Amino acid sequence: MKKIFLTLLLAAPALTLSAQVGKGGITPEMLEKIKSEQPNTAADRALRTALSGTSINQLAKNPNNPASSDTYFSHSVPSKGITDQQSSGRCWLFTGMNVMRAKMIKKYDLGAFQFSQSYSFFYDQLEKSNLFLQAVIDNAKKPMDDKLVEWLFKNPLSDGGTFCGVQDVMMKYGAVPAEVMPESYNANNTSRMSSIIALKLREYGLALRQGAAKGQKPAVLEKRKVEMLGTIYRILSTCLGEPPTTFKWTMKDAKGRPISTKEYTPKSFYEEYVGEDLKNNYVMLMNDPSRPYHRTYTIDMDRHSYDGAQWTYLNLPIEEIKPLAIASIKDSTMMYFSCDVGKFYDSKTGVLSTENFDYATLFDTDFPMDKADRIRTFASASSHAMTLMAVDLDAEGKPTKWKVENSWGPNSGVAGHLIMTDKWFDEYMFRVVIEKRFVPEKLLKLYNHEPTRLPAWDPLFSEDK
């Protein structure tokens, strides 16, 4: 009996391990086969040793990539002053404002002028809070596990965005110079403030749903929403400061000499110095090879305000986007541009090139997915906005590389700029916003077609940060 007990006791771990492996799981035999097939040459052991104390990118770096040293550009839009979004996801706002400020600097021969990002960000966060709460009211009768309702509560608020936010906030609330409402700590470091507001929004969203379940009418819920927004406003003003309603500002030229001193409201300042219909003067273009080209698409909930513009874009082959961007640069007009900036980015040189790192050789495996497959599988999407402002053309007028003005401060990249090869542009460029005057009439007609609606959880719902 004792021998039987000991035998069972010794066999128990093996039986338990075997019982834990269900169909489709990794069995001990499978694991042993995988391990036995691993290469173990001297080179493999040396590589493992090297990677134990070195970054992957450092070992995969291609030292012979010519893109790392070529900083000449045949066509470039002048700019003054590099902005810095610091530890925030406001690149979309900095980029849109960089486009606007470049025009203002050129027109009035100013120095390194900046709009207040903090002022516009304040109202962006208030508008996004209202967007969430009103969407909760609109969908209050749907179950909590409805896909849209679930998406809303997963994404109540973000500091990221698109050019739509620039359109909405500047045209609705105007703009002010940076010195009128300067950056605060919580404008530069948004994560804690955003998480606190998001927590409050989820609480409020749940309360609105509970009110609807008790039979409260939409008018009652919307009245409660206004009270809730009062709390959000208080959090924002405590963290970012109270937005000015009037201010005095002295315009100075590039040499610092005063030009004029006037009283403004944010709206009058915008109308005098920007004065542009941002919602109707621009065309939003996308390169998404996972979907049919020459069609217009819009993504549900991909907007900054409830009554604002939704991200609606004309999908074009990359070969049709490039000539439009080149025409804009030749006209000294910058563009809102966004891409998947983390792919093949060499932070030491400020260069984006598909030849920067050779991961295939390092790990002895190919990475064959093309751009369309990367989009479909959520492996790549737009992640960061910058200002497209230079292109280098060869003798035949073909682009070889591009340059963007970034918002990571003057000490990052190439004096605050990033350089991308034309091949990288093909693979990881997603959005560019171009003035209509550079777009052919046939494309404008396509842009005005009724767009195909995509759900909020589509792979291309991605905010620039």
PLM feature segments, named:
Residues 67-139:
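Post-signal peptide N-terminal segment of secreted/secretory-pathway proteins
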Residues 93, 119-122, 168, 177-180, ...:
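Structural recognition of the beta-strand scaffold that forms the well-ordered cores
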Residues 77-89, 151-157, 308-315, 324-325, ...:
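Second-shell loop/turn segments in exported
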Residues 87, 95-96, 100, 162-171, ...:
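Stable alpha-helical elements in mature extracytoplasmic
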Residues 22, 215-465:
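Active-site signature of cysteine proteases
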Residues 117-247:
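Papain-like cysteine protease catalytic cores
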Residues 1-22:
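Bacterial Sec-dependent N-terminal signal peptides
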Residues 21-81:
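N-terminal regions that are enriched for targeting/export leaders
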